[in-house]
Amino acid sequence: MLSEDLVKSGAIKFGDFILTSGKRSDYYVDIKEAATDPNLLSEIASEFSKMIHARKIAGMELGAVPLIVATSLNMGIPYVIVRKERSHGTLSLIVGRLNRGEEVDVIEDVVTTGNSVLKAINVLRENGVVVKDAYCVVDREEGGAKLLENNGIKLHPIVRISELKR
């Protein structure tokens, strides 16, 4: 089971951690580390492939990139990358092709507050695509699903942190 494999791999650690936000947490989730293991990455892509219905997927650099590439290969569908703000090159926030009106599902590694994934969704919507669903490996259950719901997005996690903390 993926949740057990994430814990065994060290992608989910229990202890005392200080998060980027400065908050303390009794667990830490590092899906970027998990995505460097080809077997675990394949397992994650397989789980996403069972859930996703759109014919194109997208994700925010950096954390979602290996996830969307692996899922794209698994499903045989194209993907786009949403970049963080740029001050050089083409300044484009999208890598890949989008068609106005097409439905795109968004993949994220970890959802906490939902702000990061919502930022990616808003960039996609500004480019004329329809986003109704977001998928994540782990939902930390700290308000992200509610924020997305308030913006017309349904969050589909593979694992909820409450399932791991039983």
Swiss-Prot record:
Keyword Transferase tagged: yes
EC assignment: 2.4.2.10
SUPFAM superfamilies with a match to the protein in the record: PRTase-like
GO terms, molecular function: magnesium ion binding; orotate phosphoribosyltransferase activity
InterPro entries on file: OPRT, Or_phspho_trans_dom, PRibTrfase_dom, PRTase-like
Positions annotated to bind orotate: 112, 140
Keyword Transcription regulation carried by entry: no
Binding site for 5-phospho-alpha-D-ribose 1-diphosphate: 83-84, 86, 88, 108-116
Biological process annotations from GO: 'de novo' UMP biosynthetic process; pyrimidine nucleobase biosynthetic process
Cofactor: Mg(2+)
UniProt catalytic activity: orotidine 5'-phosphate + diphosphate = orotate + 5-phospho-alpha-D-ribose 1-diphosphate
PANTHER family membership: OROTATE PHOSPHORIBOSYLTRANSFERASE, URIDINE 5'-MONOPHOSPHATE SYNTHASE
Protein family per UniProt: Belongs to the purine/pyrimidine phosphoribosyltransferase family. PyrE subfamily.
NCBIfam families: pyrE
Protein name, as recorded: Orotate phosphoribosyltransferase
Originating organism: Thermoplasma volcanium (strain ATCC 51530 / DSM 4299 / JCM 9571 / NBRC 15438 / GSS1)
